[in-house]
Amino acid sequence: MTEVTELSRPEGEALNTREVLLNLGPQHPSTHGVLRLVLELDGEFVERVDPHIGYLHRGTEKLAESFTYTQIFPLTDRLDYLCPPSNNLAFALAVEKLLGIEAPIRAQYIRVMMAELARISGHLLITGALPMDLGAMTALLYVMREREMIMDLLEMITGARMHTSFCRVGGVREDLPDGFFPKIREFCDIFPNRIRDYERLLEDNRVFLNRTKGIGVISAEDAVDLGLSGPNLRASGVDWDIRRDEPYEIYDRLDFNVITRDEGDCYARWRCRVDEMRESMRIIEQCIDQMPEGPFQIDMPTIAFPLDKDRVHCSMEALIQHFDLSAYGFKVPKGEVYSAIEAPKGELGFYIISDGSPKPFRMKVRAPSFVNLQALFGVTNARYLADMIAVLGSLDPVMAEVDK
């Protein structure tokens, strides 16, 4: 019988190891071809992560300098393209702040209702996509069923499923269509039970819990220092939501809770989004019940298109108004402004400098995904390589918003 001996090295000689650089993306299922992470590995541990961005850069901020304020709305659709009504709203509020105007109350209710539908749509996707990135595909198939219902509602209102471009400075493009309220009430009746389905699928799933609980922890102090916002901030125990703390539109008339958790890990960030969908449903139901009659757009010929489109065909004044706004846009007083909303990913803000012309002199977008992505620096120290996908997925960045 052959004697088994232990392999050994001379006493005092260290094991020869070296750090490895690994490219995660851009050709990787979790980064969708638009994000490259250069990982510095010590064995299976991630010592450092260096995000390389810009694969989806389209020059949104520079393009805005050549567009009228109305023409910029389609550009905002393509920031967080999962939730375009929120992007439209943030930009519209910034311009209205410069003009010193407010949209009619009915328009504000419509805007808020659409923004909350967009929030649910965005949260639904990450509710199913995070488990899918970790190997559990079933949840994604469930959430896409409800997300399709939201797409149908948005298409019913705007005529488009994704790039809605529905907001306008001073209101919205048109009023809600006939038959909309029965459709959205049907969704409101169905959706709470569907959320419970997602929870039953995942909240007791040991594999999902082991891959997310205690992984990628961000403390409250680090979250504030990094400038995180949205669910990524609230999952670390920081109770901050612009809708409640700096209310805009009609949020101060609505009753809803701000969801927070203390763990700060991947599971807490996932759980915050699931619970926020319930609060968004409460907001939508209140908007339906409180929806007032009235105009959907401000009645200012120098800013808004004619409320009655038929007047364009029989009134010279209305035709001139329509032509001027379409061809040349409206002038905004000189000044600068910053306005932010609580978008699904966090604080989405627009900083605009006006020189008094129909086009902005400078526009800066404060994109929450851009800020949230830097949290990768703080949560990956001494974590396994296999955890990187869970950490990235739980931060829920949209690269179109990062690269602009």
UniProtKB/Swiss-Prot annotation:
Its main location: membrane. Its EC number is 7.1.1.-. It is found in: Cell inner membrane. InterPro entries: NADH_Q_OxRdtase_suD, NDH1_su_D/H, NiFe-Hase_large. Keywords: Cell inner membrane, Cell membrane, Membrane, NAD, Quinone, Translocase, Transport, Ubiquinone. It is an enzyme of class 7 (translocase). Belongs to the complex I 49 kDa subunit family. NDH-1 is composed of 14 different subunits. Subunits NuoB, C, D, E, F, and G constitute the peripheral sector of the complex. This is NADH-quinone oxidoreductase subunit D 2. It comes from Rhizobium etli (strain ATCC 51251 / DSM 11541 / JCM 21823 / NBRC 15573 / CFN 42). The lineage of its organism: Bacteria, Pseudomonadati, Pseudomonadota, Alphaproteobacteria, Hyphomicrobiales. The gene is nuoD2.
